[in-house]
């Protein structure tokens, strides 16, 4: 039996504060969270996989109590996963891949809908993460450190992809899903002159200690990317911990300037 939960952890771009956190906010099967702060409101969605309608969007004003507001993907379009929910120039977007190996985007002028039909993007990879570069152009990161340029409306690819990040090399003796780093889930933000990218490594469904969240920063979306000396920011070090396979996180700031990371995990023994 698998029991995936979403958890929240207080985070300070380098220093973790562990008081009453981490705290489970979504007990149940809600993997691959993506969270957005829009003024005093927070919105979040997650992987629907084979469920339709998909991309259930949740709303909160305190990051702890949530209520559903809409489903952004009304019809089944293949197993949809690992979304990136964002707002850019007044419009909301969800970028996501499917089991077909393709990437799509949907958009809406109101987060409660109506949402557009999926627009196919000519980009390979999984777990897309949107960012606006230092040149004012829009880009999409995908797994394994690749970046692809987008059109101004964010609905088309305008150039070739290139690799700009190699990930954080975790210790060779750590027990993870396999020999591959499984560098995925790039989620980006810009703060005080730096781009920060939180990524997942180690594999999602491997041993209890496999998954993790790592952070790198750069002055440019094209790098060089400097890995945090505090990596991994989130990780299960032992199968004796309450939460297994913690990872796939998204950073978000609250209205008071505090920073948090929302990520998924398995309850101990329910993997």
Task: Please annotate each region the language model reported.
Residues 2-3, 271:
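Short glycine/proline-enriched turn or capping motifs at secondary-structure junctions
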Residues 3-13:
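Sec-dependent N-terminal signal peptides
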Residues 19-271:
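Carbohydrate-active catalytic/glycan-binding domains of CAZyme proteins
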């Amino acid at each position: 039996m698998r029991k995936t939960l979403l958890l929240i952890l207080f985070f300070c771009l380098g220093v973790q504060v562990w008081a009453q956190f981490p705290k489970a906010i979504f007990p149940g099967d809600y993997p691959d969270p993506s969270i957005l702060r829009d003024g005093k409101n927070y919105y979040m969605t997650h992987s629907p996989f084979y469920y339709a309608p998909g991309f259930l969007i949740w709303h909160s004003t305190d990051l702890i109590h949530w209520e559903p507001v809409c489903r952004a993907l009304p019809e089944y379009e293949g197993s949809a996963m690992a979304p990136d929910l964002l707002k850019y120039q007044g419009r909301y977007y969800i970028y996501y891949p499917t089991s077909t190996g393709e990437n799509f985007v949907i958009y809406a002028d109101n987060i409660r809908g109506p949402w557009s039909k999926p627009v196919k993007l000519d980009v390979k990879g999984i777990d897309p993460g949107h960012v606006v570069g230092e040149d004012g152009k829009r880009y999409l990161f995908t797994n394994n450190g690749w970046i692809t340029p987008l059109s101004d409306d964010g609905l088309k690819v305008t150039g070739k992809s290139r690799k700009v990040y190699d990930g954080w090399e975790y210790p060779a003796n750590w027990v993870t899903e396999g020999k591959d780093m499984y560098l995925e889930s790039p989620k980006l933000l810009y703060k005080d002159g730096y781009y920060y990218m939180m990524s997942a490594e180690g594999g999602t469904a491997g041993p209890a200690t496999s998954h993790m969240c790592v952070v790198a920063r750069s002055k440019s979306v094209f790098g060089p990317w400097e890995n945090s000396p505090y990596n991994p920011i989130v990780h299960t070090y032992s199968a004796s911990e309450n939460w297994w396979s913690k990872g796939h996180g998204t950073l978000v700031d609250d209205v008071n300037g505090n920073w948090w990371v929302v990520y998924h995990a398995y309850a101990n023994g329910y993997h």
